[in-house]
Amino acid sequence: MMPTPRPLPFSFASLAAALLAVIVAASPAFAAAPPKSEVVDLNAPVSYWKQIRPVFQANCQGCHQPAKNKGGYVMTDFTRLLAGGDSGEKAVVPHLPAKSPLVTAITLFEGEADMPKGKPPLTEPEVTLIAKWIAEGAVDDTPKNAVQHIDAAHPPVYQRSPAITSLDFSPDGKLLAVAGFHEVLLHHADGSGLVARLVGLSERIESVRFSPDGTRLAVAGGLPARMGEVQIWDVVKRTLVVSVPVGFDTVYGVSWSPDGKLIAFGCPDNNLRAIDAATGEAVLQQGSHSDWVLGTIFNQDGSHLISVGRDMSTKLTEVETQRFVDNISSITPGALRGGLHAIARRPGRDEVLIGGADGVPQLYQIFRQTKRRIGDNANLLRKFPAMEGRIFAVDYSRDGKLVAAASSFNGRGAVHLYTGEFDSKIPDVLLKAYADKVATAYSKEEKAEIERFTTAEVKLLASTKLTGGIYALAFSPDGRHLAAAGEDGHVRLITTTGGTVAKDFIPVPLARTKLTQRE
């Protein structure tokens, strides 16, 4: 059933004035300031690729794409964009905007528009621009090399396995989610076979995480230098439930709140963000980082969110107020030698494990016990033996007994297993020093006590050397295996008792014959 006809919001005689308000590159949800746009020639034909597509991408394609085609309508494919959906009526009638149901659906009538559902209506200049494009014939000027060829019916074809950026086991231990190209691959957790392929819009998949109950899968990624996207999949039905466009580049470090109601992620516009997992609605945006935000995790009760980034900081944010609370790790120059890439929470405690460019996994308490003083690192609980190269992934076993970290250095990779059980209570003598003195005033004895405490009961249990850098880690729920993957596209299941590789497999289906080059 098509929307009730409504009067169009423009006359073409006044079109030029309206077009002055249109941003050529429409801003997706939560967008930062867009790149500088070209000067718009108001007499030139409207470009679908440069002017119309960005509006649809930001406002419509989350619900109208091959993986989630509400009403049978797909707006990511030009032919299907014109054709319409289940009603059988064409959505776009070239040269006739007044007879195009798409224009009717997005036009305000008595302050409301039928589309986009559950979102703010398009602005009047945006609607006017779309109508002008249709009046000019609804021409498709999409570059040939930009036409989308991949969807669930036409999944990626691999000649070799791509680099793997993220892994996660389902809470019940039955599935292993693996980041691929344009998709997430669900495998049997023992590596015995592929279960499903979740193909979406995002070319690059940066992060995958199962919900606490295992019924949903959150995916962070996007189209590099064009759009970020957060996807939420129904694991049982293998269907896309929510798709949220975010900014102008891929997004990172997705995580779930303990109750499964919120999803957090980091962005290259230096913002930490969170959305409602059911609706995709924005609930948090915090801009305290000064560089890309690469990892996120909630504290035990979900009241606070912790993030790490390329700015060498670990930041604490209160969820309800969106208020920046504290720098958890030291921000003193030299305390951390490079950006932070990874974060995990210690089970049952408000403590976080972080790793980054300096190759040293470190454990911090989330909430400080003493007032911050210049140069202090008073939240540090443990330093683990250093790895060679940069750390790209860290994890804690579910029982809290083991810690793992993965690194990359000069084309080589390594996985370290450490002891994870120890008393992390800060001694009174250190609490007093942290409270009374700045770091440069610590005595020789106090410095020795800090070193003794932060390295106590910490032991390297196993070191596994691998081909290619390792970018992703995940403990199996039973703690018996550790999945590791990275540059060479292989997934290894490593035993946690000895650090040996029990299974090595390629997670993507490889083409049997070489592809011919596209013309």
Identify what each model region corresponds to.
Residues 12-14, 32, 212, 300:
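Generic detector of N-terminal low-structure segments
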